[in-house]
Regions:
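Extracytoplasmic "Venus flytrap"
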Residues: 35-54, 58, 67-80, 84, ...
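Short, solvent-exposed amphipathic alpha-helices that sit
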Residues: 47-62, 144-151, 176-195, 214, ...
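Short, low-complexity disordered leader/linker segments with a strong preference
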Residues: 1-36, 60, 65, 108, ...
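Flexible loop/hinge segments that line or gate small-molecule binding clefts
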Residues: 101, 105-143, 165, 261-269, ...
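Hydrophobic alpha-helical segments within soluble ligand-binding/sensing domains
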Residues: 78, 135-164, 211-212, 260-264, ...
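Short beta-strand elements in bilobed, periplasmic/extracellular small-molecule ligand-binding domains
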Residues: 59-71, 165-168, 189-208
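Hinge/cleft segment of the Venus flytrap/periplasmic-binding protein
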Residues: 22, 168-173, 280-329
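Hydrophobic alpha-helical
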Residues: 95-115, 185, 200-265
Length: 329
C-alpha cells in the first residue's frame, strides 16, 4: 500500500510541476502514464537507422511512445518538427541536427521540453549550458576523419609514397558531418607531410549502390587510385565494389570508412575495406532515451559538467576486429 501511495504521489507531483505543459499524459483507462518523445534525424542511413532502432527499443522498455521523423537534411523542416512536438505537448525531443549552428533555434522551438542532441554537436557549446535540461551525446566528428587520415598517412609513409592519389566520397556536399570528417582527414594527411592529389571528390549520398554506380563510371578511364576515403561504411563498400568491377586490385588500394556497422565489419573481415572507426549506436539511441527518462524524473544534469557526453571513436582493422567484436562470428 505504501509503494502504491508513493507511486501516486510521485506522478501527482510531476503533473503539478509540469502544469499546462502536460509533460506526463495519463491514460485514464489503466492509470498508466503515457509519455511521448519526438526524435528528428537529419537524414536516413545505416548508422542513423541503427541509432533509431536502439532508441525505439529503449522507448519500448520504458513503455513510452517514440515518434521518429527525418528532416531530409533541411534545417527549416527540422525546426518545424520540433515546434510541432512542443505545441502537441510532447515530453521531450531527441535531435540529430542538420546544421550544427541551429542549436539555439531548436531550443527556442522546444520551449520547456528536455532536448538531447546526438551525433552532431551544436557548434556553439554555450547552447548546451543555457538550460539544465539540454545535453549532447556522441563523438567528435573530426576525430573520425582524423583517425582515417592517420591510417592512410601511415600506410603511404610505409610505401614511400609522398604524393598519393586519393578518391574522396562524401555523404552530401552540404552535410556538416560529412564535411567535418573530410576536412579532418585531409588535415591529418597534410600534417603527416604528404602532398596528396584528390583525383575524385563526389557525393555518394551515404548510399552503397549510388557510390558504386557513380564511382564505376569515373573508373572507366582507368585513373590511378592509391586510396579511397569515404565518410561512412556503406560508401566505402560501394567504392570497393566499383573498383573490383573495374578490374582494380583491392589488395593494393586502402579503403577507409566510418561507423563499423555490421556490414562494414564484414567488409573489413573479407578485405573489401581496410579501416573503419566505431561509434556505438546504443550510446546515442538508447542513451538519449535513458537520459530523457532521467530528466523527466527530476534529475537534471549539471549544465557546466554534464552537458556533453563524449564517446570516443575506436579504430577498427583486420588486426583488432575479432577482439573488438567477438560476437560477430
Amino acid at each position: 500500500m505504501r509503494k502504491f501511495l508513493k507511486f501516486i504521489l510521485s506522478f501527482t507531483l510531476i503533473a503539478i510541476l509540469c502544469g499546462c505543459q502536460r509533460t506526463v499524459i495519463f491514460d485514464i483507462y489503466n492509470n498508466h502514464p503515457k509519455i511521448k518523445i519526438g526524435m528528428s534525424i537529419s537524414s536516413e542511413g545505416t548508422f542513423l537507422n541503427n541509432v533509431c532502432a536502439s532508441a525505439k527499443k529503449a522507448a519500448d522498455e520504458h513503455d513510452v511512445q517514440l515518434e521518429i521523423l527525418s528532416a531530409n537534411n533541411d534545417q527549416k523542416t527540422q525546426s518545424e518538427q520540433i515546434k510541432k512536438w512542443a505545441d502537441d505537448n510532447y515530453a521531450a525531443v531527441i535531435v540529430v541536427l542538420c546544421d550544427d549552428t541551429a542549436g539555439k533555434q531548436i531550443l527556442e522551438n522546444a520551449g520547456t521540453m528536455p532536448v538531447v542532441f546526438i551525433n552532431l554537436c551544436p557548434s556553439d557549446h554555450e547552447v548546451l549550458q543555457s538550460k539544465q535540461n539540454v545535453i549532447y551525446i556522441g563523438g567528435k566528428e573530426g576525430d573520425a576523419g582524423r583517425l582515417q587520415g592517420e591510417f592512410l598517412s601511415e600506410y603511404f609513409i610505409s610505401q614511400n609514397n609522398n604524393t598519393p592519389t586519393i578518391a574522396v566520397i562524401s555523404g552530401e556536399s552540404d552535410n556538416f558531418t560529412s564535411n567535418i570528417r573530410i576536412d579532418a582527414a585531409k588535415e591529418a594527411i597534410s600534417n603527416a607531410g604528404l602532398m596528396p592529389f584528390y583525383v575524385y571528390e563526389s557525393s555518394g549520398g551515404w548510399d552503397k549502390s549510388k557510390t558504386q554506380s557513380d564511382f564505376y563510371k569515373f573508373l572507366q578511364s582507368k585513373p590511378t587510385i592509391d586510396a579511397v576515403l569515404a565518410v561512412n561504411d556503406d560508401m566505402a563498400i560501394g567504392a570497393a565494389d566499383a573498383l573490383a568491377q573495374a578490374g582494380y586490385a583491392l589488395s593494393s588500394i586502402p579503403i577507409v570508412g566510418v561507423d563499423a556497422t555490421p556490414e562494414g565489419r564484414a567488409a573489413v573481415r573479407d578485405g573489401r575495406i581496410d579501416f573503419t572507426v566505431y561509434q556505438n549506436p546504443e550510446y546515442q539511441g538508447a542513451g538519449a532515451v535513458n537520459e530523457i527518462m532521467t530528466m523527466l524524473g527530476g534529475d537534471m544534469p549539471n549544465a557546466d559538467v554534464d552537458s556533453i557526453q563524449w564517446h570516443e571513436y575506436m579504430p577498427v582493422t583486420a588486426a583488432n576486429i575479432d577482439q573488438l567484436f567477438p560476437d560477430d562470428r
